[in-house]
Amino acid sequence: MERLIDKMFKKNNKNMSENYFKFSKENMSKVNQTLKKYPLSQKSSAVMPLLDIAMRQSGGWIPDSAMHEIASIINVPYIRVYEVASFYSMFNLQPIGKYFIQVCTTTPCWLRGSDSLVNICKKHLTIDNNETSQDGLFTLKTVECLGACVNAPMVQINDNYYEDLTDISLLKIIENLKKGVDNKVGSQLKNRKGGEALNVK
């Protein structure tokens, strides 16, 4: 009978990279610069920024071998790195699409229609939550607060925020991404900059 502990830490086939992960020369320089920000006795605190560097190098996800490499660099057991990577939703342990769509579904966004935004994504990308489209372009994920409540509802696509969304504006963004056309980042309202109050008369 398989032990529970074995089930918990069994590697997923998609994350069993046979290739040994090594930071590129450029990224190793970033790793070293990051480590300088921490006392030698506290370099394990650099786990999150190092995971981010590894994820960007790997195309948006963190292979198992990258977590082993980070554990070696900061001198902690592998499981300590895995605990952090698996706890935070911003870290992906599976490959993702070219465009990673994260729809905020916390209360402010939900009250402003985030459920409808999720449905728009599912319908027009023909994927469900935590799935990637067959063409490899899009991955959809519902997430908790992304910190832009004043501009609800909003989504994050890769590193960009798209705020004050409607079904129509989100659909336009998706269609532009399919065509390789740039989108306006930030508030999708014509006369709103950042989180300034709306002038409602």
How should these model regions be labeled?
Residues E2-K201:
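Signature of N-terminal electron-transfer/Fe-S-associated modules in redox systems
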